[in-house]
Amino acid sequence: MRRCAALLLVYALTIPSNFFGADDAPLSGYSPRSSQSERDWEAKFRAIPDPANLREYMKRMSARPHHVGSPYDKDNAEWILARFKEWGLEAHIETFNVLFPTPKVRLLEMIEPTKYTAKLEEPAIAADPTSNQKSEQLPTYNAYSPDGDVTAPLVFVNYGLPEDYEKLDRLGISVKGAIVIAKYYHSWRGVKPKVAAEHGAVGCLIYSEPQDDGYTRDEVFPQGPMRNPNGVQRGSVMDFASNSPGDPLTPGVGATADAKRLSVKEAKSISKIPVLPISYGDAQPLLAALKGPMAPNEWRGSLPIPYHVGPGPAKVHLKLEFNWDLKPVNDVIAKIPGSVEPDEWIIRGNHHDAWVNGAEDPVSGQAPLLEEARGLGTLLKQGWKPRRTIIYAAWDGEEPMLLGSTEWVETHAEELKQHAAVYINTDGNDRGLLSMGGSHSLEHFINGVARDIEDPETKMSAWQREHLSDIAQASADDRKELRERPDIRINALGSGTDFTGFLDHLGIATLDLGYGGEDEQGIYHSIYDDFYWYTHFSDYDFVYGRALSQTVGTTVMRLADAEVLPFQFTNQADTVHKYIGELQKLLKDKQEEVRERNQQLQEGVFKATFDPRRPTVAPAREEIPPHLDFAPLENAADALSRSAERYQKALGTKQAGLDQQGVETLHALNAKLIESERKLTNEDGLPRRTWYKHLLYAPGVYSGYGVKTVPGVREGIEQKNYAEANQEIVRVAKALEAESTLIDSAAQMLEQTSHP
């Protein structure tokens, strides 16, 4: 959505001036003396990133297709390695061998009631010079679909989510033995074949609906930024949320040369039914051939056809075969050793692989990472020395499902548990507002960074612009909180990019940052995501790339140099209380929904509204969900609030003398702070998916990338497993109690330190 800067400025008059920070206030975790020195170094750093360099980095890295195992993927890794070394960082390439299937046979044809053979191809466009590199481009496909040869009636299932199948049940339609066709979006793509298989389907097609990223939203490429009739979204359909991301053959351990591997048949995360992505140009003849009930109004897209559900009379034949080969992924790892606490690590990452040329995804994020590294290298030559060790990582294999970062995390898990303080992630970057997500112990900290970054278009701070934009779009209740709460609430993280192993598996405090939201785009995972598209329809002057370098570079420096890691737990406690309220409302809403539906069944409402020309099946009567005992969770959250306030008070009284505390004292205190996020994990993991250890954040089993907060409890309620939800309440409460105890011990340590 485009925003009006004039409207935002009107709202600025309503915000207290102290919301925008003050340069003379000491930074969190710094004494006044070290704070001023830090601000001076940060100002020098923010003057370094250059849009001209970002443009050249993107042009170079996106010049050819660079998917996993391709020659240019390796070439880019070696080029990045050379740049890190040129700028004074210690650097090496770490290689893992992972399963990465590529297609041998792709056939989709309609055999009844008429004949149609899908093109399954994105043609080159004359205006777009890299779109013609066909011999190097991966075909349009979904990685980790199994081989398959199926012929079956077609059924349209909207977005292919569980609630869509509930609607099909009401229509009396089964997908058992059918091939389903689903729209992209509203969930991670791998959820669609997962749910289809659970309902008995034998195959799955996923198409890009023009209502979502095509001509309904703007002109199509090359006249505009949106997906044209032949554009296809490649992507992984690995069932990572129910199992784990990374190499399917080495779950839980690094995919090193000598790792013990499963067979492909033993790999649990490979999709259960064949899956193929198609364009809306190929989807239209298939959808037009469907009959049966008209699709519900909210299912209908913008193709010039009546949207029927089926089944049939359209019958399709889908045949897929893949090369099931191991391919190398090349992670580029660079290091700046810490001068005081080298065994505490600040890790910064972005991936470098793409499905094709990948200018937007991922190079628009990778280029700013490189410019950050160049900037820090420049500061090193001027005498700056980070207190902690900084690690820069250019991950490979993110697109197939976080292969490079996950294998690195699993290989180095014990080291990371001991040393990793914070992980900071970026991915694709565009023009617009700053998006902040991550661990809520870092919420106050990252708000402070955002206050110090200038938005390139409005010249107000990135924080102020985001804050005013939130007010412009908020409800009356939300506007009240936005105006009263000092910090913007940051997003909780699920998955979908390289922070997953750090946060969800190891419990390392994490941030995920990026700009965007102002420009439409419809080239995601297609051959048209390239330098031509980006420099015509996105951040073509690279000023938001520079802003990302400035934002994340400042974040890295501020974390690396602080005497005390700038964790703040009052915002985290507030967020936990908010999650508990959401869970209680979720349960209450479900109870009321079931109670009302049961009453309508008893009253005969469904019988009275039955239309024999449009027959539907009445829902089944259900037991009303039981009450859950949230008291342990509420008590634990209250304890966390008290501990957080105690720690904040203790830190405030000792902040002036932090630079005079001994290294051993500060190291012991920081070790507790690093451990705080780990306390929110459980070694047994989440129910039925033990790789995911974090009890507050996880990707949803039926949402994929989308986060489920307090996932064991929330998904227990959503999936009607109420006994399990009660058990998870107790587990989460114990984790919060353990974190509270740790925070109390950190507060006590501060209280007992001598005054400067």
Per-range role (PLM):
Residues 653-756:
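C-terminal amphipathic alpha-helical interaction region
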Residues 132-167, 243-360, 374, 378-382:
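Soluble metallo-hydrolase cores and metallopeptidase-like ectodomains found primarily
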Residues 24-36, 40, 59-174, 210, ...:
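Noncatalytic luminal/extracellular "stalk/propeptide" segments of secretory-pathway proteins
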Residues 7-16:
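Bacterial N-terminal signal peptides
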Residues 145-146, 228-294, 341, 397-530, ...:
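Metal-dependent peptidase/peptidase-like ectodomains
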Residues 210, 332, 348-402, 407, ...:
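Alpha-helical metal-binding/catalytic segments enriched in His/Glu/Asp
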Residues 40-48, 62-71, 140-145, 179-186, ...:
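Second-shell loop/turn segments in exported
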